[in-house]
Design a protein with these regions (language model features):
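TRNA-recognition modules of translation machinery and tRNA-sensing kinases, especially anticodon-binding
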Residues: 1-154
Length: 154
């Protein structure tokens, strides 16, 4: 009997007949973000585990129960990204993007990974759009992000 390999529980295949829908959504989101002055950023699929422990919180369910982590040579430990803000902020700081002036506006459309109980609408690998406005404490910044979200949904 042949061994049948199936996709992991909580993941989905985006087959050729469905990819066009993804491209359409990604285009709408990207164009809206760029109209508002956001620039796309792409961060690694995995980061040092400590980044998420510090930013998300050591006692949160995400860190305690839901992260996919692996140990590497030495004392290194890496985690598949469970959310986007931590890696995005690390990249903004590490690459000196804030030195280009404030506020800095970045967006991402990425895959994320959490070991959760699967159910309709909740997968272990999921896709998310996010935007970060760095260096502005103004309520106008929040209003701008809300306006961006509304324009995507319209």
């Amino acid at each position: 009997m042949a061994l049948i390999v199936k996709k992991p529980k909580g993941t989905e295949d985006i087959v050729p007949s469905k990819v066009y829908k993804w491209h359409t959504v990604e285009k709408i989101v990207s164009e809206a973000a760029e109209i508002y002055g956001f620039k796309e950023i792409r961060v690694p699929t995995f980061e040092e585990t400590g980044l998420f422990v510090r930013s998300v919180g050591e006692t949160t369910d995400v860190v305690q129960k839901e992260m996919y982590s692996v140990s590497a040579a030495g004392d290194s430990k890496f985690t598949l990204r469970p959310e986007g803000t931590s890696g995005t902020m690390r990249a903004v700081l590490e690459n000196g993007i804030m030195n280009e002036g404030l506020p800095q506006k970045v967006y991402y459309i990425l895959s994320f990974f959490r070991h959760e109980n699967t159910q309709k609408g909740r997968l272990r690998e999921f896709h998310q759009f996010g935007c970060e406005m760095v260096g502005s404490e103004s309520p106008r910044a929040d209003a701008e992000v809300i306006s961006l979200a509304k324009s995507v949904l319209d």
